[in-house]
UniProtKB/Swiss-Prot annotation:
Binding site for substrate: S180, I181, D182, R217, M224, G225, R226, E280, R307, H313, V314, Q315, R316
UniProt-listed Pfam families: PFK (PF00365)
Gene encoding the protein: PFK
The name this protein goes by in its record: ATP-dependent 6-phosphofructokinase
UniProt superkingdom: Eukaryota
Length: 789
């Protein structure tokens, strides 16, 4: 029987399913019009959405317009509403802010202002709007839509437009993209800009940690978020903060005593610094808890050298993260398609996306968002946390557990029993490995489990290189890349399997967690199949996929892949800058990934590359050159051409061969250069996404392992031969799923080390469209209502 356990979010907003797999033809909506504008506060990733709206709209045959300066530009009209060309979307995806400007507009709140806006849109022939902004911008758009028929009638009555024009524009259609660093809008997993803001926060805190350790200081870091504590909470998890203040879960009245006691305990454990994260506008019973107040409490009570760092608008700035670039691109494309398919009865919707995308009713999301604010104003904190969603709840629960210092006598998971659980890294190092190990260790210590580590993978295990973990052993592990345990690619084999079994028996290991890549998955499969011969392997085994290649079956995303894509995008941005100076140059960039083209495809899409050569999609010399798009780009626009090639895309068409091909083709017209990015792609400091995913997956893995240990216990001995006790913990869609590795074996190409089914291949048509290749595009829709947490 297949084992796929997951946690369902029963109270989630139910979306309307789209048309996954349907074909969208070139020039399908020729003659239609679309306008895009950004409103309210800016956020990183908005330009990616603008880039995608322009190019998808033009691909579909639409006339696409920019409305500069947000709603104010719509009211003022004139040169603020301009037609966009294909090149309008060039070289903007890596830029922060919004190239078309944004402004807060009071005129639109008045009927006279809305009348002017309606007139200007009719004059330009625009009735389809893509709104990129926060909840205020989206609510304003919905009100504008409701008033539209009356506004048009009044324009006819005052003879500002003709009755014929009124008949041509009887209604207006609106699709919203939520652009906000706060991530405070219900109905979408992540808003555009949130991931980038988290990266700015973590970069700042990581920098602060160095000086804090040097001087044994305490730092109070104030972050943005308005009335939402998402940024503060997730940042606290990602930087191992000692304390966190968020508006959804304010501390008790005696928070001063609790805070100081916690900081003293951490110093007593040998920690040289303390980090406290404070969300702006955090309050308890109407009394604000400011960063300065927290600083004064610590400094006066504990006499610690305490400093305040207010990050401010730094959080909005800088280049967007790869996640936000991809988010903007995919949302923008889907927004145009949604507009084209709307009719008079269609209500405004919001494009929501995580691994899949779907449409959710705008006002349903707005009402849910208002319900959170109402719960907080009524001091119903439990309801406020619940309404934020299961992901927010899980973040809060994990934070509470990981910041506990003292072991509780009895835990509801272990039932007060002591179990021996071990953890090891297998495969190549990747961002998030250390975060996963830290989380597993500390979550194990809380219920009084004995947590052991095996160093240097199976080589170390066979040689007995183990150590029992203590709480302080994993302090500050989250912020570091690589693997502190040491990791090797060696698989269990005939020589070392007996030694591995002996060590597991010697240390009475009752469960084993492997954090690593394809090798970790394959190793677990080998151990599982050797259970008949070695009873020491008849224990719960679990794998957390952690590899930059994202080539492990049973999961959509592997730990470390987000860090790698961000590193690749950063390097490509610098290469593009070089090309901007030299002009008329083709760059061929080689990425890692083995035979898996995930890194090449997603980094190409996130960096605005023109093509990506991968093993999964065959290419030839004729295909590479016949489009002639590289010649067109040299003659106009940015005058460069960028190709991302996966390292094993084709054994004959190597990176050097492709370079020589383009060099010969471009004699006298353009030059060609190659860049092999190498091991720099494994990244330095892990991204917040990888840190927190590793933290939460390891916590979930431990919960599941403890349950399996108790279910497999017979007369005090753990023994199980069930395939369902050797699992891989992965993300499929929006679900966290434990899948037996023996079941996954049927879905694996072991020769090429690839899953047989890879979701991201559906992004290939979008990559080609945005790079000006005529292609068929496949829309995606959510298949379920379950939530990754």
């Amino acid at each position: 029987m297949s084992l796929k356990r997951n946690i369902r979010r029963l109270d989630s907003i139910v979306p309307t399913a789209g048309r996954e797999g349907s074909d969208i033809q070139f020039n399908l909506y020729k003659g239609r019009g679309v306008a895009v504008f950004t409103s309210g506060g800016d956020s990183q990733g908005m330009n990616g959405a603008v880039h995608s709206v322009v190019r998808m709209g033009i691909y579909l045959g639409c006339k696409v317009c920019f409305i500069n300066e947000g709603y104010q530009g719509m009211v003022d009209g004139g040169d603020n509403i301009v037609e966009a060309s294909w090149n309008s979307g060039s070289d903007i995806i890596q830029k922060g802010g919004t190239i078309i400007g944004s402004a807060r507009c009071t005129d639109l709140r008045q009927r006279e202002g809305r009348m002017k806006a309606a007139y200007n849109l009719i004059e330009k022939g625009i009735t389809n709007l893509v709104v990129i902004g926060g909840d205020g911008s989206l609510i304003g758009a919905n009100q504008f839509r409701k008033d539209w028929p009356g506004l048009v009638k009044e324009l006819v009555d005052t003879k500002k437009i003709t009755p014929e024009a009124a008949k041509s524009y009887p209604n207006i259609q609106i699709v919203g993209l939520v652009g906000s660093i706060d991530n405070d809008f219900c109905g979408t997993d992540m808003t555009i800009g949130t991931d980038s803001a988290l990266q700015r926060i973590i970069e700042s805190i990581d920098a602060v940690v160095a000086t804090a350790q040097s001087h044994q200081r305490a730092f109070v870091v104030e972050v943005m978020g308005r009335h939402c504590g998402y940024l503060a909470l997730v940042a606290a998890l990602a930087c191992e903060a000692d304390f966190c203040f968020i508006p959804e879960w304010p501390p008790p009245v005696n928070w001063r005593e609790i805070l100081c006691k916690k900081l003293q305990e951490m110093r007593a454990e040998g920690q040289r610094l303390n980090i406290i994260v404070v969300a702006e506008d955090d309050d308890r019973d109407g009394t604000p808890i400011s960063s300065d107040l927290v600083k004064d409490v610590v400094a006066k009570t504990l006499k610690y050298d305490t400093r305040v760092t207010v990050l401010g608008h730094v959080q909005r700035g800088g280049s967007p993260s790869a996640f936000d670039r991809l988010l903007g691109c995919r949302m923008g494309a889907e927004a145009v398609l949604a507009l084209m398919e709307m009719n008079e009865e269609s209500e405004p919707c919001v494009i929501s996306i995580m691994v899949t995308r779907w449409y959710v009713p705008l006002m349903q999301c707005v009402e849910r968002t208002k319900a959170v604010q109402k719960a907080m104003s009524e001091k119903d904190w439990e309801l406020a946390v619940k309404l934020r969603g299961r992901s927010f709840q899980r973040n809060l629960e994990t934070y509470k557990l990981l910041t506990k210092l003292r072991t509780v006598e009895k835990d509801n998971l272990s039932g007060g029993q002591n179990f021996n659980v071990a953890v090891m890294n297998v495969g190549a190092p990747a961002g998030g490995m250390n975060a996963a190990v830290r989380s597993f260790v500390r979550m194990a210590i809380v219920p009084s489990l004995y947590s052991l580590r095996y160093e240097d993978s199976f080589e170390g295990l066979a040689n007995g290189a183990f150590k029992k973990f203590q709480w302080g052993d994993v302090t500050n592990w989250v912020m570091h890349g690589g693997s502190f345990l040491g990791t090797q690619k060696q698989l269990p084999n005939e020589k070392n399997v007996p030694l591995i079994a002996e060590q597991l028996r010697k240390h009475n290991i009752q469960a084993l967690l492997l954090v690593g890549g394809f090798e970790a998955y394959h190793s677990t499969l080998i151990l599982s199949k050797n259970r008949e011969k070695y009873p020491e392997f008849c224990i719960p085994l679990c794998v957390i996929p952690c590899t930059i290649s994202n080539n492990v079956p049973g999961t959509s995303i592997s730990l470390g892949s987000d860090t790698a894509i961000n590193e690749i995008c950063t390097m490509i941005d610098k290469i593009k800058q070089s090309a901007t100076g030299t002009k008329r140059r083709v760059f061929i960039i080689e990425t890692m990934g083995g035979y898996c083209g995930y890194l090449a495809t997603l980094s190409a899409l996130a960096s605005g590359a023109d093509n990506a050569y991968i093993f999964e999609e065959k290419f030839t010399v004729e295909i590479s050159l016949r489009r002639g798009s590289h010649r067109c780009k040299m003659a106009q626009g940015v005058q460069r051409y960028l190709i991302v090639r996966n390292e094993y895309a084709n054994k004959n068409f190597t990176t050097e061969f492709v370079k020589q091909l383009f060099a010969e083709e471009g004699k006298g017209e353009f030059s060609t250069r190659i860049n092999i990015l190498g091991h720099a792609q494994q990244g330095g400091s892990p991204t917040p996404f990888d840190r927190n995913m590793g933290t939460k997956l390891a916590a979930r893995a431990l919960e599941y392992i403890i349950t399996q240990i108790k279910e497999s216990m017979v007369n005090g001995v753990v023994s199980t031969k069930s395939p369902e006790r050797a699992t891989l913990l992965g993300l499929t869609g929006r679900r966290v799923v434990f899948t037996p590795v023996e079941e996954l074996a049927a879905e694996t190409d072991f020769d090429k080390r690839l899953p047989c089914d890879q979701w991201w291949l559906k992004l290939r048509p979008l990559l080609r469209i945005l790079a000006k290749h005529t292609s068929i595009y496949h829309t995606e829709a959510m298949e379920d209502t379950e939530d990754y947490d």
